[in-house]
């Protein structure tokens, strides 16, 4: 996405080059800031996670990351992974992390990131975008709903889908220190 004015912020959204140190540094810094948010882990990333994050994203075969900039300053990130829908026999993109720095919130940066992901998904023939959001994160839910997201349902009478997780590491090795039973 070319640079555009979005509610007083000059936003440029680019697909990150995971071989570019400037991009990977911005990704790690933004994910670390996201981790410290009260609606995330509420604590910085562990040093070993910070050290492994860029190479882990680079080495994962389905990683797709978008960065939002205001001038030279990184202000948002969308970390995504390609998946596959067996019911549609088509690829999909899961937005695993979406974060905007606090002083750029409410200015359309999240929507610009979501639009960039959506454009890429359409280009790649994806059947849908998926994401998870805390029920209590009303602000994020509003943004997602305004962008066309809704709780996943397959049969209305069956109710909505739930996201579930099973930790595989012992408690002292879990990356998510605050939410018992989940890993981010």
Model feature map: region roles:
Residues 1-25, 29, 36, 170-184:
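Conserved N-terminal entry element of GNAT/NAT acetyltransferase domains
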Residues 65-67, 73-82, 94, 99:
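Conserved beta-strand in the GNAT
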């Amino acid at each position: 996405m070319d640079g555009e004015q979005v509610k007083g912020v000059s936003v440029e959204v680019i697909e990150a080059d995971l071989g570019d140190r400037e991009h990977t540094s911005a990704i790690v810094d933004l994910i670390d800031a996201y981790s410290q948010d009260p609606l995330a882990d509420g604590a910085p990333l562990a040093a070993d996670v910070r050290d492994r994050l860029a190479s882990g994203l680079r080495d994962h075969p389905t990683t797709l990351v978008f960065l939002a900039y205001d001038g030279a300053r990184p202000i948002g990130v969308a970390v995504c992974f390609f998946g596959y829908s067996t019911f549609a026999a088509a690829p999909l993109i899961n937005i695993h992390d979406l974060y905007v720095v606090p002083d750029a919130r409410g200015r359309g940066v999240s929507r610009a990131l979501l639009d960039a992901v959506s454009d890429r998904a359409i280009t790649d023939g994806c059947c849908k975008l998926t994401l998870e959001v805390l029920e209590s994160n009303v602000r994020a839910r509003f943004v997602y709903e305004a962008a066309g997201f809704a709780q996943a349902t397959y049969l209305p009478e069956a109710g909505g889908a739930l996201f579930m997780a099973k930790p595989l590491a012992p408690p002292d090795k879990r990356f998510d220190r605050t939410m018992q039973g989940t890993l981010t």
